[in-house]
Amino acid sequence: MIIIPAVDLKDKKCVQLIQGDPNKKHLELNNPVEVAKKFVDEGAEYLHIIDLDAAFGTGNNRDVIKNIIKEVNVPVEVGGGIRNLEIAKELISLGVDRVIVGTKAILEPKFIDDLNKEIGKDKIVLAVECKEGKVVIKGWKEKVDKTPIEVIKEFEDKVGYILFTNVDVEGLLKGINVDIIKELIEKTDIPIIYSGGITTLEDIKALKELGIYGVVIGSALYKGLIDLKKALEIVKN
């Protein structure tokens, strides 16, 4: 299992939002490049970067992403506002390892087919965000009448990874829902990256035991609830 620290970008700063709400931040740091470097210095082997401005349609942070890639020697995955092939290709050309797509793919499945032809499925992460058992899109504002497993099955042979977010606990530091993750792992062969509500080393142990591919950790690292080095030790042992 790999641990993937999250660096969320807004207005060229590193932020942490509560429940994805742009007006509710519980953290703002001025130098995202330094934040990324610190995670890598502590042993992170992969980074998860979300461009919130691109996601909200209020600009983008591509220059910051470019600088992070230049300064760290680990691969990064990037999500947020990837609504056409040009943006995806531009990110890959900047040195991004994987692009994360969600809403666009779920509303227009052909987008994944086209993206697959352009960059290959190993570079594609499908974001499946779940609230009260159903998939949500458009920044968690709209519900789709499908369960996570139904959406995953639809794209199973077209994407390399699934990023599964449990919106019910995201950014609230509430712990994880093991049952929902267990079901996904049992029903699909795609590597699953889990995000949402991870607060303790116990959560990480539980996810490791389930056999998940990776976990994204945000709030808990920034608030000092999880020590990255200790988390990485659990994963390696």
Swiss-Prot record:
Its EC number is 5.3.1.16. CDD domains: HisA (cd04732). One of its GO terms (molecular function) is 1-(5-phosphoribosyl)-5-[(5-phosphoribosylamino)methylideneamino]imidazole-4-carboxamide isomerase activity. One of its GO terms (biological process) is L-histidine biosynthetic process. SUPFAM superfamilies: Ribulose-phoshate binding barrel (SSF51366). It is found in: Cytoplasm. GO terms for cellular component: cytoplasm. Its main location: cytoplasm. Pfam families: His_biosynth (PF00977). The active site is at residues 8, 129. Keywords: Amino-acid biosynthesis, Cytoplasm, Histidine biosynthesis, Isomerase. It is an enzyme of class 5 (isomerase). It comes from the Archaea. InterPro entries: Aldolase_TIM, His_biosynth, HisA_bact_arch, Isoase_HisA-like, Isoase_HisA-like_bact, RibuloseP-bd_barrel. Pathway: Amino-acid biosynthesis; L-histidine biosynthesis; L-histidine from 5-phospho-alpha-D-ribose 1-diphosphate: step 4/9. It catalyses: 1-(5-phospho-beta-D-ribosyl)-5-[(5-phospho-beta-D-ribosylamino)methylideneamino]imidazole-4-carboxamide = 5-[(5-phospho-1-deoxy-D-ribulos-1-ylimino)methylamino]-1-(5-phospho-beta-D-ribosyl)imidazole-4-carboxamide. Belongs to the HisA/HisF family. This is 1-(5-phosphoribosyl)-5-[(5-phosphoribosylamino)methylideneamino] imidazole-4-carboxamide isomerase. It comes from Methanocaldococcus jannaschii (strain ATCC 43067 / DSM 2661 / JAL-1 / JCM 10045 / NBRC 100440) (Methanococcus jannaschii). The gene is hisA.
